[in-house]
């Protein structure tokens, strides 16, 4: 059985210099290395805010030499304005019909939403979306899921938003698209702050590492170990920054 993700708990809540964070405890990786994790709470980040300023405000007071920062992809999307609003997306005939056949899960609407499906069509083209839909329908008969996203490619699986059940009203009207230069963004943030950075798109189902600065002292597998229980939390917890502190 894998590690079960959990929400931040009140008994884990701490505060330092006005910064609220949650002590997510120690986790041991497959290689025996251990990591302390701190989930740092922020305000709801708006489009165009500075990622450097956010790190200096929320992360700097808790940072120790040797720590690694897991920076949430949704916040990075907001900072670099990698977003689309409903007004910018016009669902056509195919989007208005195909969305009914898409799946849905508790972390988001998947493609079960015409605006989101139209955004994918705009990104990768209708022929690829139709091919992906056919492949997905066939493979689902054999219990294979996720083929639609693999065939579409181009980071389609990282699109979030247009989700009317979100706790945040802004996400009802806006979609976030993972940036296509994650390594560069991490390198620039390290250059500006001196803190090694990993860009993570995490939820309770998976933890996708989008990029990292070259100064991160952990392997990709060790990063996955440190984030295995999704210490960022799920939904409305507003803890997109995770300080990973290697202990041995």
Locations of the language-model features?
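N-terminal and secondary-structure boundary signal
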Residues: 2-248
């Amino acid at each position: 059985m894998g590690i079960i993700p959990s929400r931040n708990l009140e008994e884990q809540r701490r505060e330092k210099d006005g910064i609220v964070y949650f002590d997510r405890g120690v986790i041991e990786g497959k290689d025996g290395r251990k990591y302390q994790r701190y989930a740092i709470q922020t305000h709801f980040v708006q489009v165009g805010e500075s990622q450097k300023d956010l790190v200096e405000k929320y992360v700097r007071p808790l940072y120790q030499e040797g720590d690694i920062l897991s920076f949430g992809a949704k916040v990075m999307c907001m900072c670099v304005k990698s977003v689309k609003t409903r007004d910018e997306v016009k669902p056509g005939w195919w989007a208005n019909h195909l969305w009914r056949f898409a799946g849905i899960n508790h972390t988001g609407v998947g493609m079960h939403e015409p605006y989101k499906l139209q955004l994918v069509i705009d990104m990768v083209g209708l022929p690829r979306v139709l091919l992906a839909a056919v492949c997905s329908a066939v493979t689902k008969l054999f219990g294979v899921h996720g083929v639609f996203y693999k065939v579409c490619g181009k980071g389609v699986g990282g699109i979030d938003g247009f989700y009317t059940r979100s706790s945040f009203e802004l996400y009802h009207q806006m979609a976030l698209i993972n940036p296509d230069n994650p390594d560069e963004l991490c390198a620039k943030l390290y250059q500006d702050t001196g803190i090694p950075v990993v860009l993570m798109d995490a939820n309770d189902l998976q933890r996708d590492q989008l990029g990292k600065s070259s100064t991160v002292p952990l392997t990709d597998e060790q990063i996955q170990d440190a984030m295995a229980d999704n210490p960022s939390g799920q939904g409305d917890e507003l803890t997109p920054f995770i300080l990973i502190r290697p202990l041995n």
